[in-house]
Curated annotation (Swiss-Prot):
Active-site residues, as the UniProt record annotates them: H54, D71, C122
Alphabetical UniProt keywords: Autocatalytic cleavage, Disulfide bond, DNA-binding, Host nucleus, Hydrolase, Late protein, Protease, Thiol protease, Virion
One example of a Gene Ontology biological process annotation: proteolysis
Activity: how regulated: Requires DNA and protease cofactor for maximal activation. Inside nascent virions, becomes partially activated by binding to the viral DNA, allowing it to cleave the cofactor that binds to the protease and fully activates it. Actin, like the viral protease cofactor, seems to act as a cofactor in the cleavage of cytokeratin 18 and of actin itself.
Entry's transmembrane regions: none
EC number, UniProt record: 3.4.22.39
HAMAP family membership: ADV_PRO
Name under which the protein is recorded: Protease
Taxonomic placement: Viruses, Varidnaviria, Bamfordvirae, Preplasmiviricota, Tectiliviricetes
Pfam families: Peptidase_C5
Catalytic activity: Cleaves proteins of the adenovirus and its host cell at two consensus sites: -Yaa-Xaa-Gly-Gly-|-Xaa- and -Yaa-Xaa-Gly-Xaa-|-Gly- (in which Yaa is Met, Ile or Leu, and Xaa is any amino acid)
Molecular-function GO term, any one: cysteine-type endopeptidase activity
Functional note: Cleaves viral precursor proteins (pTP, pIIIa, pVI, pVII, pVIII, and pX) inside newly assembled particles giving rise to mature virions. Protease complexed to its cofactor slides along the viral DNA to specifically locate and cleave the viral precursors. Mature virions have a weakened organization compared to the unmature virions, thereby facilitating subsequent uncoating. Without maturation, the particle lacks infectivity and is unable to uncoat. Late in adenovirus infection, in the cytoplasm, may participate in the cytoskeleton destruction. Cleaves host cell cytoskeletal keratins K7 and K18.
Localization (cell): Virion; Host nucleus
């Protein structure tokens, strides 16, 4: 089943992101409400009524006027639209970010894959990214102690047998990271790992 909204919220708070975390949202995320405040959110590509499909993480750094979009699969804009019918451009337009003085916002998006194709851990990877974002907001994607635990591979190799070992190690590193920093994860580890396992989505099963 992957991760529930309540679960992700509990883990994000354990990771120290609480003061900046706006919450979990479905595809109707209204955007960032304050252009002057460091803030972040976890957003699903589908409507809440569907039960959810895929989690993404967003972060806004007012100092650099940069909006970060983290997708554990590193899909291109076109693929996000093709697979999930999800577009974030309208999200940025209706956000308070459009009210910046020069209306100039830099979008930095993850382009590499860190999650296996059959893994259901997208929400947990988003929690990990938000830890990096709130602690190193000027370079949350890489070159920080959190995200450097993961090894990205080109998105075009997502289904390649050559990278299975790398992506499996990423998920193991993710679990170790959360086990170290999140009491909620520790107390519920067996259930969470079963629900988000590396092969959870194989054969189309959730």
């Amino acid at each position: 089943m992957g991760s529930s909204e309540q679960e992700l919220t509990a883990i994000v708070r354990d990771l120290g992101c609480g003061p900046y975390f706006l919450g979990t949202f479905d595809k109707r995320f209204p955007g960032f409400v304050s252009r002057d405040r460091l803030s972040c959110a976890i957003v699903n590509t589908a409507g809440r009524e569907t039960g959810g499909v895929h989690w993404l993480a967003f972060g806004w750094n007012p100092k650099s006027h940069t909006c970060y979009l983290f997708d554990p699969f590193g899909f291109s804009d076109q693929r996000l639209k093709q697979i999930y019918q999800f577009e974030y451009e309208s999200l940025l337009r209706r956000s308070a970010l459009a009210a910046t003085k020069d209306r100039c916002v830099t979008l930095e998006k993850s382009t590499q894959t860190v999650q296996g194709p059959f893994s259901a851990a997208c929400g947990l990877f988003c929690c990990m990214f938000l830890h990096a974002f709130t602690h190193w907001p000027d370079h949350p994607m890489d070159k920080n102690p959190t995200m450097d635990l993961l090894t990205g591979v080109p998105n075009c190799m997502l289904q390649s047998p050559q990278v299975v070992g790398t992506l499996q190690r990423n998920q193991n590193e993710l679990y170790k990271f959360l086990n170290n920093l999140s009491p909620y994860f520790r107390h519920n580890r067996e259930r969470i790992e079963k629900a988000t396992s590396f092969t959870k989505m194989q054969n189309g099963l959730k």
